[in-house]
């Protein structure tokens, strides 16, 4: 298919390694410019690789003569040398784009021109300008290096004026700028593919968890309302459209504490740590997507979707620690975990904080991903995140609602149970309903008596299915509760069970979950078979002893 295409890759680290893996399947020849025995070269037996620094101008010229196309696995390269060879070989993304993005301040200025939502920032050529920025933005603020900044390196959070000299010294002689500190609730990322003709395609929004300023975990999709995920994808695509050049771009963003505002943090013009999950979770990995984009091969929105509507992924970085055996322990343990795929990068020396590999866990629910992740950590008593919420208006309802919990325990479905009053704690009810989906809940069981507004009000504020349990009160035998819950207006459904029958609510919740959890579907079939057997046993007994001698 691509026998004539020869791709030169500047950089032979783990990103280059995984790019080469994808290239092999597409029959694309790769020539790598980096040190001898770099991770990418270990898995490509070609003899034309160049053993030199990927910033060496002469080596870049030599590479260009052997290839039809140059690309990079890292943005910290010699853009002047790349620009000089563009007359004889294609470079993707363009040297101009790489030059703009590798300088974080230029990147922010560029995006600001196109009205991309960003934190406030300003230049900081000297200590006086940093002090002025502190007065303008307030404390804390973030002092950042314009260049050679990644994985938290090149950033310093300044909490008070006296820390400014220390911060400047810590960041060395590199040019600096100041960014206003934004109180965020979550860090997210979207991988965006840009084709040669400028079309852009977004992978799902992911949630990234940092540890010691290095990406530690990636949840795909992010644990956010779908509307927020879509807005993040739109912002990421809008940002990538402003640049020239094909390839994959990693767009990092913040979700602020209001849960609505999204600001762009920074862009990487290459495969990104937050996109590793795509190897197992999507039809086309970020590495293959990059190659398809720069080589002009077919690509569409289907390539960037999760493989199924129930696919969930959790990517765990394996970082070196003080324990020399840590990496091998995690690697070996991962091989016994269902749905887990191990990627080791071929790095000989394990240093603290060094990326040695990653594990991607795939399952049909985020809770199952979490459970398997705890297996990876060898947690003895793993705590599972709830997928069902059981709520009631008062503790007086507990005697009727506990049967739902009994059923969920029987099916081993994790749940949370609490009191949420529609009338006495309306703010708590609103918060509970609006955050339920993003917290990982998939079904809500709401019990209420009398006016019984709780199920309907919750259903009006969450996209999740709500099961209403009419609770028998002191008057009207619970018929008032039943009538209240079933009389919901069009567009706001509540699945209502019989009065006081929270057991059926629990069973219905399990059936809803079973539509995308095969293991739960099998358990439900077994439950139904067991009920049948109980009835058949009773029928057999009645027929044998007769009605006069029958006792239940």
UniProtKB/Swiss-Prot annotation:
PROSITE patterns: ATP_GRASP. GO terms for cellular component: cytosol. Residues 108-295 form the ATP-grasp domain. Its EC number is 4.1.1.21. Pathway: Purine metabolism; IMP biosynthesis via de novo pathway; 5-amino-1-(5-phospho-D-ribosyl)imidazole-4-carboxylate from 5-amino-1-(5-phospho-D-ribosyl)imidazole (carboxylase route): step 1/1. ATP binds at residues 134-189. It is an enzyme of class 4 (lyase). Keywords: ATP-binding, Decarboxylase, Lyase, Nucleotide-binding, Purine biosynthesis. InterPro entries: Ade2_fungi/plant (IPR016301), ATP-grasp (IPR011761), ATP-grasp_carboxylate-amine (IPR003135), ATP_grasp_subdomain_1 (IPR013815), PreATP-grasp_dom_sf (IPR016185), PurE_ClassI (IPR033747), PurE_dom (IPR000031), PurK (IPR005875). GO terms for biological process: 'de novo' IMP biosynthetic process; purine nucleobase biosynthetic process. Pfam families: AIRC (PF00731), ATP-grasp (PF02222), PurK_C (PF17769), RS_preATP-grasp-like (PF22660). It catalyses: 5-amino-1-(5-phospho-D-ribosyl)imidazole-4-carboxylate + H(+) = 5-amino-1-(5-phospho-beta-D-ribosyl)imidazole + CO2. It comes from the Eukaryota. In the C-terminal section; belongs to the AIR carboxylase family. Class I subfamily. This is Phosphoribosylaminoimidazole carboxylase. It comes from Schizosaccharomyces pombe (strain 972 / ATCC 24843). The gene is ade6.
């Amino acid at each position: 298919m691509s026998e004539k295409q020869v791709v030169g890759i500047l950089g032979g680290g783990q990103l280059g390694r995984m790019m080469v893996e994808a290239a092999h399947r597409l029959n694309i020849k790769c020539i790598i410019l980096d040190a001898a025995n770099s991770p990418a070269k270990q898995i490509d037996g070609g003899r034309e690789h160049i053993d030199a620094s990927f910033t060496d101008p002469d080596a870049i010229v030599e590479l260009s003569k052997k290839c039809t196309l140059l690309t990079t696995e890292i943005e910290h390269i010699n853009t002047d040398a790349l620009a000089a060879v563009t007359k004889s070989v294609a470079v993707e993304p363009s040297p101009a784009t790489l030059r703009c993005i590798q300088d974080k301040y230029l990147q922010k200025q560029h995006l600001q021109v196109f009205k991309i939502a960003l934190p406030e920032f300003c230049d900081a050529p000297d200590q006086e300008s940093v002090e002025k920025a502190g007065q303008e933005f307030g404390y804390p603020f973030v002092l950042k290096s314009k260049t050679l900044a990644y994985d938290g390196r090149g950033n310093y959070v300044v909490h008070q004026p006296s820390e400014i000299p220390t911060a400047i010294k810590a960041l060395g002689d590199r040019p600096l700028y100041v960014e206003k500190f934004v109180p965020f609730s979550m860090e997210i990322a979207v991988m965006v593919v840009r084709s040669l003709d400028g079309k852009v395609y977004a992978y799902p929004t992911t949630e990234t968890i940092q540890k010691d300023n290095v990406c530690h975990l990636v949840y795909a999709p992010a644990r956010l309302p779908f509307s927020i995920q879509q807005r993040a994808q739109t912002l990421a695509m809008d940002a990538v459209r402003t640049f020239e050049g094909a390839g994959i771009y990693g767009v990092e963003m913040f979700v602020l504490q209001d849960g609505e505002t999204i600001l762009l943090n920074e862009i990487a013009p290459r495969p990104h740590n937050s996109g590793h999950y795509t190897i197992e979770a999507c039809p086309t990995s970020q590495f293959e997507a990059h190659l398809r984009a720069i080589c002009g091969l077919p690509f569409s929105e289907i390539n960037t979707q999760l493989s199924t509507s129930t696919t969930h992924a959790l990517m765990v970085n394996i970082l070196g620690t003080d324990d020399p055996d840590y990496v091998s322990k995690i690697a070996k343990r991962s091989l016994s975990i269902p749905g887990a795929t191990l990627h080791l990068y071929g790095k000989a020396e394990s240093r603290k904080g060094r990326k040695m590999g990653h594990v991607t866990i795939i399952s049909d629910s985020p809770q199952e991903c979490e459970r398997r992740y705890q297996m990876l950590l060898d947690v003895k008593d793993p705590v599972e995140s709830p997928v069902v919420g059981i709520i009631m208006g008062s503790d007086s309802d507990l005697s009727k609602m506990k049967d739902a919990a009994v059923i969920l325990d029987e099916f081993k479905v994790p749940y949370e149970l609490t009191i949420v009053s529609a009338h006495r704690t309306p703010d708590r009810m609103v918060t509970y309903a609006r955050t339920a989906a993003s917290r990982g809940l998939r079904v809500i069981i709401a019990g209420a008596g009398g006016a019984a507004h709780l199920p309907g009000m919750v259903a009006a504020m969450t996209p999740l299915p709500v099961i209403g349990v009419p609770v028998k009160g002191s008057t009207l035998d619970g018929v008032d509760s039943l009538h209240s819950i079933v009389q919901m207006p069009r567009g706001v459904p509540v699945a209502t069970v019989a009065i006081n029958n929270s057991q059926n609510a629990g069973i219905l919740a399990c059936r809803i979950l079973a539509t995308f959890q095969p293991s739960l579907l099998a358990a439900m079939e077994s439950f139904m078979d067991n009920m049948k057997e109980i009835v058949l046993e009773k029928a057999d007994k009645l027929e044998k002893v007769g009605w006069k001698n029958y006792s239940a």
